[in-house]
Design a protein with these regions (language model features):
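Amphipathic alpha-helical interface segments within eukaryotic helical scaffold
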Residues: 63-109
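Juxtamembrane loop segments immediately following a transmembrane helix
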Residues: 117, 132-165
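Intrinsically disordered terminal tails
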Residues: 1-34, 38-48, 104-112, 153-165, ...
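Juxtamembrane/interfacial segments around transmembrane helices
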Residues: 58-71, 131-141, 170-183, 211-219
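Alpha-helical recognition domains of nuclear gene-regulatory proteins
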Residues: 12, 25, 53, 82, ...
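C-terminal TM-helix exit segments that contain a strictly Trp-centered aromatic cap at the helix terminus
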Residues: 23-27, 98, 130-142
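Physicochemical signature of membrane-embedded alpha-helices that form the seven-helix bundle of GPCRs
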Residues: 6-16, 79-93, 117-131, 163-173
Length: 219
């Protein structure tokens, strides 16, 4: 019962991780312009994401421009696009597989089949968490490196946006859920299956008794 409750808790974490992963992939605020120097008095907030660049004005207007050219993008943005999409796909597969393999559901067949399905879903969550953690870390590193570069003007410096933090938290949720599923699927009772129950066979005694019975019949 405790294992089923733990799996349900991991499933809720995985759901939050999936929704956060998809949200972080689509949000345009992976990095925002830094409020340093002359940028403090500006009335424009510039945001850059994986798929579009957006500008928010103090008047309330909002405009976005899609990034149509893939080859013109920096390498870390191309890698972030690929890994975040893979993370979303793997986490969605993990949700479907663990829903079948969880102990609190009536799907998936016998106990062994449900355990293997649950373990496969946990592996999907772990891979999704890794694929979500790599681009957010790389993207953050590039932002910090450009911010500390003295040759870059202050108007071109940026800070990590909300999408990066959402990606970090979602990757953590997926990793925790994957570890819980992988460790809770194959819990067995102590001593079960290790030492088979002793079996006593007395073939010689049975044969002697049968032989004696047969001789008495012929007397």
């Amino acid at each position: 019962m405790a294992s089923a409750s733990l799996q349900f808790f991991a499933f809720i974490l995985a759901l939050f991780g999936v929704f956060g992963d998809i949200t972080a992939t689509l949000l345009p605020n992976w990095k925002v312009n830094a409020d340093v120097g002359s940028n403090i008095i500006t009335a424009i907030t510039q945001m850059q994401g994986l798929w579009m660049d957006c500008t928010w004005y103090s008047t309330g207007m909002f405009s976005c421009t899609l990034k149509y050219s893939v080859l013109s993008l920096p390498v870390y943005i191309q890698a972030a696009r690929t890994t975040m999409v893979l993370s979303c796909i793997l986490s969605a597969f993990g949700i479907c597989i663990t829903a079948v393999g969880m102990k609190c559901t009536k799907l998936g067949g016998d106990t062994d089949s449900k355990s293997h399905a649950c373990f496969a879903g946990g592996v999907c969550f772990i891979l999704a968490g890794v694929f979500g953690l790599v681009p957010t870390s790389w993207y953050t590193r590039e932002i910090i490196a450009n911010f500390l570069d003295q040759t870059i003007p202050e108007s071109s410096k940026h800070e990590p946006g909300g999408a990066v933090y959402t990606g970090f938290i979602s990757a953590g949720f997926l990793l925790i859920a994957g570890v819980i599923f992988c460790t809770s699927c194959f819990n067995k009772q102590p001593g079960a299956g290790v030492y088979p129950p002793p079996q006593h066979h007395f073939p010689s005694t049975e044969q002697e008794s049968n032989a004696g019975y047969d001789l008495k019949d012929y007397v």
